[in-house]
């Protein structure tokens, strides 16, 4: 579930499809209507794009639905929308999270790699390669810093698969800083004062 930046809409996945509902009125709109499933919704900063993971043709990808008409302000009352693939075709990708400044989308690629891509398009930037593996939905977590310059995530450093640490990743350089190095599994991180 995701709340739009202006607080006027809530996006959610119900029975595998994306819906958006108004917080002010009793209006709900179905965004997707496919035999495959969707999950993990995230609004853009301006609320005009909705990102989500969707299974299409047997492959998970990050998709977005865009408000195409200038006069449309909300998904619940939009006259037209357009769905498009955001991640690379043929690469398993899911769990999109839009940065607070609206410039980036972070997501998991191939179940092992944390990547970012600019919302305007362009190349995908790998931030954390292949050490982690996502066995089930939501078992890999990451969060944007309030200034959109860093990501916090759990990762496997020197301790192997049974010892996760908390990493601070600088998006611009890709520098990974292990914040915990405790010798024990660490998790449940949060940004403070954001």
Segments the model singles out, each with a brief description of its role:
Residues 5-6, 45-46, 100-101, 146-147, ...:
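Residue-level detector of Asp-centered blade-edge/turn motifs that repeat once per structural unit
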Residues 8-19, 23-24, 30-39, 48-75, ...:
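A flexible loop/linker signature enriched in serine peptidases of the S9 family
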Residues 78-84:
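A short helix->beta-strand "capping" segment at the edge of beta-propeller domains
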Residues 170-194:
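Repeat-solenoid scaffold signature
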């Amino acid at each position: 579930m995701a709340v739009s930046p202006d607080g006027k809409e809530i996006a959610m996945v119900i029975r595998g499809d994306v819906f958006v509902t108004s917080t002010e009125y009793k209006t709900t709109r179905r965004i997707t209507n496919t035999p495959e499933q969707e999950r993990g919704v995230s609004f853009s900063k301006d609320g005009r794009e909705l990102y989500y993971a969707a299974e299409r043709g047997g492959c998970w990808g990050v998709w977005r639905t865009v408000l195409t008409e200038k006069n449309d302000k909300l998904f619940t009352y939009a006259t037209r929308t357009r769905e498009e693939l955001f991640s690379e075709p043929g690469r398993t990708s899911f769990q999109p999270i839009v940065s607070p400044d609206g410039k980036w989308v972070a997501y998991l690629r191939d179940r092992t790699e944390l990547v970012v891509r600019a919302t305007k398009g362009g190349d995908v930037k790998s931030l954390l390669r292949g050490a982690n593996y996502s066995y089930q939905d939501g078992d890999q977590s990451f969060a944007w810093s309030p200034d959109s310059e860093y990501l916090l995530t759990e990762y496997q450093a020197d301790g192997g698969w049974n010892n996760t640490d908390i990493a601070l990743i600088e998006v611009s350089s890709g520098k990974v800083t292990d914040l915990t190095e405790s010798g024990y599994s660490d998790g449940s991180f949060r940004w403070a004062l954001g």
